[in-house]
């Protein structure tokens, strides 16, 4: 299974760290954030990774190269202007092929074992959901058995971790340009084609300096 890491965000909430460094290369406990994903993907048996980028993206290519030092083959999907999640994935589909692929947001840190996602995909998407963090109390979706449905205001919603397996058919009918992933997922949910799981391990959306410190604390505990 191929994997894609979303790495095109500007990281504006992490300034000044991201003024001259793309967020995926910001050090977390002494290691660029994106390298945690690359090492975990390689450990899970992934061999081919696609990374999209926009803001200071050449730095990402220069730092990671062809991926061989991680035991991976890395290809890049540069974006002149950020295409948001859906548009960025759609642009990279020719590099990802026709089979389901693993997707992970480049700005999260987690101890999730990506090998758990190697099982055959049933439907169009499989989402890893986590408990709602304090900064996202309403959550995103709801897990009913093994099916994911859209969230609501009632208790019991969960947050999309940014980790998933997607089938390229999810993007049928899409056009090139900037668009979000969430509407496509909700459309597939309405058709009963999105499965999911609730992960209760460590997961941090490293989107602010405070949450960067939280991730570093968790990594320190594991050392």
UniProtKB/Swiss-Prot annotation:
<comment type="pathway">
    <text>Cell wall biogenesis; peptidoglycan recycling.</text>
</comment>
<keyword id="KW-0460">Magnesium</keyword>
<dbReference type="GO" id="GO:0097172">
    <property type="term" value="P:N-acetylmuramic acid metabolic process"/>
</dbReference>
<dbReference type="InterPro" id="IPR050065">
    <property type="entry name" value="GlmU-like"/>
</dbReference>
<keyword id="KW-0548">Nucleotidyltransferase</keyword>
<dbReference type="InterPro" id="IPR054790">
    <property type="entry name" value="MurU"/>
</dbReference>
<dbReference type="InterPro" id="IPR005835">
    <property type="entry name" value="NTP_transferase_dom"/>
</dbReference>
<keyword id="KW-0119">Carbohydrate metabolism</keyword>
<dbReference type="GO" id="GO:0046677">
    <property type="term" value="P:response to antibiotic"/>
</dbReference>
<dbReference type="GO" id="GO:0071555">
    <property type="term" value="P:cell wall organization"/>
</dbReference>
<feature type="binding site">
    <location>
        <begin position="11"/>
        <end position="13"/>
    </location>
    <ligand>
        <name>UTP</name>
    </ligand>
</feature>
<feature type="binding site">
    <location>
        <position position="105"/>
    </location>
    <ligand>
        <name>substrate</name>
    </ligand>
</feature>
<dbReference type="GO" id="GO:0009252">
    <property type="term" value="P:peptidoglycan biosynthetic process"/>
</dbReference>
<feature type="binding site">
    <location>
        <position position="23"/>
    </location>
    <ligand>
        <name>UTP</name>
    </ligand>
</feature>
<keyword id="KW-0046">Antibiotic resistance</keyword>
<keyword id="KW-0961">Cell wall biogenesis/degradation</keyword>
<dbReference type="GO" id="GO:0000287">
    <property type="term" value="F:magnesium ion binding"/>
</dbReference>
<dbReference type="InterPro" id="IPR029044">
    <property type="entry name" value="Nucleotide-diphossugar_trans"/>
</dbReference>
<feature type="binding site">
    <location>
        <position position="205"/>
    </location>
    <ligand>
        <name>Mg(2+)</name>
    </ligand>
</feature>
<protein>
    <recommendedName>
        <fullName>N-acetylmuramate alpha-1-phosphate uridylyltransferase</fullName>
        <ecNumber>2.7.7.99</ecNumber>
    </recommendedName>
</protein>
<keyword id="KW-0133">Cell shape</keyword>
<feature type="binding site">
    <location>
        <position position="107"/>
    </location>
    <ligand>
        <name>Mg(2+)</name>
    </ligand>
</feature>
<comment type="function">
    <text>Catalyzes the formation of UDP-N-acetylmuramate (UDP-MurNAc), a crucial precursor of the bacterial peptidoglycan cell wall, from UTP and MurNAc-alpha-1P. Is involved in peptidoglycan recycling as part of a cell wall recycling pathway that bypasses de novo biosynthesis of the peptidoglycan precursor UDP-MurNAc. Plays a role in intrinsic resistance to fosfomycin, which targets the de novo synthesis of UDP-MurNAc. Is not able to use GlcNAc-alpha-1P and GalNAc-alpha-1P as substrates. Cannot accept other nucleotide triphosphates (ATP, CTP, TTP, or GTP) than UTP.</text>
</comment>
<comment type="similarity">
    <text>Belongs to the nucleotidyltransferase MurU family.</text>
</comment>
<keyword id="KW-0808">Transferase</keyword>
<keyword id="KW-0573">Peptidoglycan synthesis</keyword>
<feature type="binding site">
    <location>
        <position position="140"/>
    </location>
    <ligand>
        <name>substrate</name>
    </ligand>
</feature>
<dbReference type="GO" id="GO:0070569">
    <property type="term" value="F:uridylyltransferase activity"/>
</dbReference>
<dbReference type="GO" id="GO:0008360">
    <property type="term" value="P:regulation of cell shape"/>
</dbReference>
<feature type="binding site">
    <location>
        <position position="205"/>
    </location>
    <ligand>
        <name>substrate</name>
    </ligand>
</feature>
<comment type="subunit">
    <text>Monomer.</text>
</comment>
<dbReference type="GO" id="GO:0009254">
    <property type="term" value="P:peptidoglycan turnover"/>
</dbReference>
<keyword id="KW-0479">Metal-binding</keyword>
<dbReference type="GO" id="GO:0097367">
    <property type="term" value="F:carbohydrate derivative binding"/>
</dbReference>
<dbReference type="Pfam" id="PF00483">
    <property type="entry name" value="NTP_transferase"/>
</dbReference>
<dbReference type="GO" id="GO:0002134">
    <property type="term" value="F:UTP binding"/>
</dbReference>
